[in-house]
Amino acid sequence: MSSHKLYFKITNEKENHNGFQYNDGLNVLKEKFNDDPTASCVAGGFYFTNSENIFEFLDHGIYLREITLPTDDPDFKMVQDKNNKWRANKIILGKKYNLNNISTFEFLISNGANIHADSDYAIRWASINGHSEVIQFLISNGADIHANNDFAIRWASIKGHLEVVQHLISKGADIHTDNDYAIRWASKNGHLEIVKFLVSSGANIYANDNCAIKWASGNGHSEVVQFLISKGADIHADNDFAIRWASIIESMCE
């Protein structure tokens, strides 16, 4: 018999962590259990959390697993770790959910997941990974798109997730935060369509001493460079930085 209380764990693609291969059903620790309640993030235990805090751990993998505990087992041991997690010497892996699926987040929210945990990490994580439908769902449930200095729009721009950028801006994300961070990094990484959309939304191409064109040039993104020039970016900024660092500019200046 196991506990009726439901916990959760996030696993990676192979569901293997620190050399231990997790399997459906009962998993038993092979090494000695670390029962020191003052120790944190140590070997000697299977880690898991509850529904309220699961969003803090989204970057640990791609699957959500339901966890129940074999509390009727006389050899079962468990301690509460720091930072909203527990560890035990035995856990039971139940249902598996994919973290890129909106239904997973609907399930978690319905089971009490805190959408604002760890400075709205859920929407920040979804923006990094380009999960547009998940983002829309999180926003509709009150997620703060401005958390951590508009982290979501900044990282969606860095990673090249156009649909996410478009949706965040439609909901009021600040494209000018941190000296127009979004267009500077979209330019650096060569995300032309995002650069175009940010400019059409009012991004400042001159921010940080024409950083966008300098970074685009330095990384060889000629189409971004050409577009920025067409919008008036200064290729001579910072003592001709763009020209000095990218030979692609020379033909444009002849």
What are these regions (language model features)?
Residues 94-117, 125, 129:
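Leucine-rich, hydrophobic repeat-scaffold detector
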Residues 116-125, 146-155, 176-185, 206-215, ...:
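Ankyrin-repeat boundary/"N-cap" motif
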Residues 1-43, 71:
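ADP-ribose/NAD+-binding catalytic cleft of ART/PARP-like enzymes
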Residues 32-97:
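ADP-ribosyltransferase catalytic core
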Residues 104, 133-134, 164, 193-194, ...:
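Conserved ankyrin/ankyrin-like repeat signature
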